[in-house]
Regions:
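N-terminal "arm"/small-domain region of PLP-dependent enzymes with the aminotransferase-like
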Residues: 1-64
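Short acidic capping loops at alpha-helix termini that bridge into adjacent secondary structure
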Residues: 34, 84-88, 108-111, 155, ...
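Phosphate-binding glycine-rich loop
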Residues: 63-111
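Conserved PLP-binding catalytic core of the aspartate aminotransferase-like
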Residues: 282, 292-326
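PLP-dependent enzyme catalytic core of the Aspartate aminotransferase-like
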Residues: 322-326, 331, 335-369
């Protein structure tokens, strides 16, 4: 019996999501230590102290189920961003929410629009529900919003937009998004995936929650894995109009957010100093990456995220493999249709130094531009 024959039709064409290589795996494979992982856009400052203290206070209560509605976390999010608790949906990471949006608003033969070179989970969730994927060719490695509008049809149910985009780091301004949303029919749900929004400079950051007042079909999705440092706990949230939030919470699994994730998220919601420290390091070190690439004539895509994508003008897999032997893990993105690129997470200064040294050795970079 081949069980693929009884699987959902959409599942048959899927391949499992390939995460960045874990440090422990490379240690086992090559027997090396002092490895630097710059592959998964994780927080280089580690787990925030505010969350550690909150977890310690929660440990004696783990025999109880978590708060299924996440009342205290919703209250903290609402207070921080000036929204209402009934606008909020909590997820087991923002990936959980992306799947939830697809299950709630699209079905078999409905159309889902997203960009070429956008987050790979968008096509995964689209195919899993047997919906029709409409991948719009990228414009300068980012979203072609006019192309999105042209692709709209009576069958379009859902649009995914990552801002900043992963894995390219492209960024859409608030004016661009506002003009786009004004042209999208209200019956089409637009998901604005802001997993990396904290890394944008405050002066240019999109006030996405204000857009919710103008566009009732908008959902803003955010993650606590990146700037907030809670990747291992899996927690994210979405903000939408209350009617959409109600529908999402009908589909959302009960207890999808565990107690430690909830209590940690509540703590970091008020830990502005930690998030600013992370963002400032990212801005400073991003400039070093850009200067390095310019110095050695390496093309890169300007990024507003906590990563930079470099175009090596040749298949990048051998470069990736050699970097592994130097104890540096980065992210190959051939699965995104970008076989000549590698995505590098912005780390601490010493981690970035190790990458620069390793890449110069791997590419034999001697002649500065």
């Amino acid at each position: 019996m081949q069980y693929i024959n009884v699987a959902n039709q959409g599942v048959k064409s899927l391949s499992p999501y390939q995460a960045g290589k874990p440090i422990e795996e490379l240690e086992r494979e090559l027997g090396i230590t002092n490895i630097v992982k710059l592959a998964s856009n994780e927080n280089p400052f580690g787990f925030p102290e505010s969350a550690k203290k909150a977890i310690q206070a929660q440990l004696d209560h783990l025999t109880r189920y978590p708060d299924a509605n996440g009342f205290e976390l919703k209250a903290a999010i609402a207070k921080k961003f000036g929204v209402q608790p009934n606008q909020i949906t909590l997820g087991n990471g923002s990936n959980d929410l992306l799947e939830l949006f697809a299950h709630t608003f699209a079905g078999e033969h409905d159309e889902v629009i997203y960009s070429q070179y956008a987050f790979i989970v968008y096509p995964l969730v689209t195919k899993a529900i047997n919906a029709v994927a409409k991948e719009i060719p990228a414009k300068d490695w980012g979203h072609d919003l006019n192309g999105f509008l042209t692709a709209l049809s009576d069958k379009t149910k859902l649009i995914f937009i990552a801002n900043p985009n992963n894995p390219t780091g492209n960024f859409l301004t608030e004016a661009e998004l506002d003009a786009f949303l004004a042209k999208v029919p209200e019956k089409v749900i637009v998901v604005l995936d802001e997993a990396y929004t904290e890394f944008t400079h405050p002066s240019e950051r999109v006030n996405s929650f204000a857009l919710l007042d103008k566009y009732p079909n908008l959902i803003v999705s955010r993650s606590l894995s990146k700037a907030y440092g809670l990747a291992g706990l899996r927690i994210g949230y979405a903000v939408s109009n209350p009617e959409i939030a109600d529908l999402l919470n009908r589909v959302r699994q009960p207890f999808n957010c565990n107690s430690l994730a909830l209590t940690s998220a509540i703590a970091v919601m008020s830990d502005d100093a930690f998030v600013e420290k992370v963002a400032e390091n990212n801005r400073r070190e991003m400039k070093r990456y850009e200067a390095f690439c310019q110095q050695y004539g390496l093309d890169f895509i300007p990024s507003k995220g906590n990563f930079i994508t470099i175009d090596f003008k040749q298949p990048a897999a051998p470069i990736y493999d050699t970097l592994l032997r130097e104890g540096v893990i980065v992210r190959p993105i051939a699965g995104y249709g970008m076989p000549n690129h590698l995505r590098i997470s912005i780390g601490l200064p010493q981690e970035n130094d190790k990458f620069f040294t390793a890449l110069k050795k791997v590419l034999n970079l001697r002649n500065e531009k």
